[in-house]
Amino acid sequence: ILGDILNYGPRNSIPEGIDAKGIVEALNKRANDIIAVRGNCDAEVDQMLLKFPMMGDYTLLVDEDRKLFLTHGHIYNKEKMPQGHVDAIVYGHTHLWELSQQDGTLVCNLGSITFPKGGNVPTFMTYEHGVFTAYTLDGKALKQERI
């Protein structure tokens, strides 16, 4: 989970139908399977409710020989890459999906399921064996890139 887990920030009202307590319960049931990072709208009070760590600015995931840098995107992104080589930087902060190559690194912006911007449809991505695929919510593949 790449941040902004329970709240969309104090400048935005919580949309009707969003059940933060229900989200906490559902996520805590899967706590042992979740890798999460902090978004710009997450706070220590959120961490007090969740049973998995989520306050780190990034995590480095290694899959075989591939390094994936997972972050929210408000600190590290395609304009401010992490130091050292990573095969992919994965984030979502802008809510604008993207799969592109930049100087030997795959840039993966997941977009947003709930709040897509820029006229985009809701999107999500999968990662399997070095391949990222962007999808619409109805399962239509939009683009695929291999690390």
Identify the residue ranges that each predicted region occupies.
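Alpha-helical context
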Residues: 3-4, 37-39, 103, 111, ...
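Conserved beta-sheet core of the metallophosphoesterase superfamily
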Residues: 56, 67-69, 74-145
